[in-house]
UniProtKB/Swiss-Prot annotation:
This is Pantothenate kinase. InterPro entries: P-loop_NTPase (IPR027417), PanK (IPR004566), PRK/URK (IPR006083). It catalyses: (R)-pantothenate + ATP = (R)-4'-phosphopantothenate + ADP + H(+). Gene3D superfamilies: P-loop containing nucleotide triphosphate hydrolases. GO terms for cellular component: cytoplasm. Its EC number is 2.7.1.33. Disulfide bonds: none annotated. Pathway: Cofactor biosynthesis; coenzyme A biosynthesis; CoA from (R)-pantothenate: step 1/5. It comes from the Bacteria. PANTHER family: URIDINE KINASE (PTHR10285). Its main location: cytoplasm. It comes from Shewanella oneidensis (strain ATCC 700550 / JCM 31522 / CIP 106686 / LMG 19005 / NCIMB 14063 / MR-1). The gene is coaA.
Length: 316
């Protein structure tokens, strides 16, 4: 299979699902149906066959790459005459709202932690690095939430830099999708994992995307391997609307929810509002900031109907 995108054709090896699945090479399935149920996100239909065909080969590839990095580190440590360093391997996972980044990240975390070379795999989402709700309101950024300027990039870079440098304990803020805000006084502590998976909308951005100050470091400067989860925009919008309806019946019904006022909407009203949110916020953010970074990824997972992976693109 060859990509129709000329840039992708030049940069990537392209695999159809069947071609990619044979690269599993006898890697055992370690997840049960119940495990997978616990990892699924809202409105996602990931099956065990999807894990077998797509995620197990990817787990094998990443294991080989991480082992090679570890061996290189040992050689360098021996050359420098120093004790083995403890710098974790950092994987970033990017893509649009509603594409299924979080589920992909959780499945990868579960599979990668089964390998003896890297049993400690942590997962951090960049949602926690969004400015607090009060700050977004004060800055007039509430309708730009998810855009690059809505993140505390200084805090995020300091976090990822601390992890990469091998600091014993580094804290990341925790985000609540119920209150639509950071949780005050709570944090996730990352303590020298073998692998860190960093999942978020804009983790592939570089200095090319920030002409104001290209001298400052970016998250992508600290990443060893990057993944982009891709889908056609009409599918993304459809999945967002379906997820919005699911939230209306679930999370939005919580009186503490920032979006509790949506809980009483009819299906038609909810669909109209979800479409408007997509057209005014999520769609423009995808077109302006997220999708343009796609071809910087080392690997692209392309989804088709029903959230099923159809193709995998691997950097040459």
């Amino acid at each position: 299979m060859t990509s129709k995108n000329p840039i992708q054709k030049a940069l990537y090896l392209a695999f159809e699902r069947a071609q990619w699945s044979v690269l599993r090479d006898a890697v055992p399935m370690t997840l049960s149906e119940q495990d997978l149920e616990n990892l699924r996100g809202i409105n996602e239909k990931v099956s065990l066959s999807e894990v077998t065909d797509i995620y197990l080969p990817l787990s094998r590839l990443l294991n080989l790459i991480v082992k090679a990095k570890q061996q290189r580190g040992l050689v360098l440590d021996e050359f420098l005459g120093q004790k083995p360093s403890s710098s974790p391997y950092i994987i970033s996972l990017a893509g649009s709202v509603a594409v299924g980044k979080s589920t992909t990240a959780r499945i990868l975390q579960a599979l990668l932690s089964q390998w003896p070379e890297h049993p400690k795999v942590d997962l951090v989402t960049t949602d926690g690095f969004l400015y607090p709700l009060a700050d977004l309101k004060r800055k007039g950024l509430l309708q730009r939430k998810g855009f690059p300027e809505s993140y505390d990039m200084k805090m995020l870079v300091e976090f990822i830099s601390g992890v990469k440098s091998g600091q014993p304990h580094v804290n990341a803020p925790i985000y609540s999708h119920v209150t639509y805000d950071r949780i005050r006084g709570q944090h996730q502590t990352v303590s020298q994992p073998d692998i860190l998976i960093l999942e978020g909308l804009n983790v592939l951005q570089t200095g090319l995307d920030s002409p104001v100050d290209i001298r400052r470091p970016f998250v992508s400067d600290f990443v060893d391997f990057s993944i982009y989860v891709d889908a056609e925009e009409h599918l993304l919008k459809q999945w967002y609307q379906e997820r919005f309806l699911q939230f209306r019946k679930g999370a939005f019904s919580d009186e503490k929810s920032y979006f509790h006022h949506y809980a009483s909407l009819t299906d038609d009203e909810a669909n109209t509002i979800a479409a408007k949110i997509w057209d005014t916020i999520n769609g423009p953010n995808l077109q302006l900031n997220i999708q343009p970074t796609r071809e910087r990824a080392h690997l692209i997972l392309q989804k088709g109907q029903d959230h099923l992976m159809s193709h995998v693109l691997l950097r040459k």
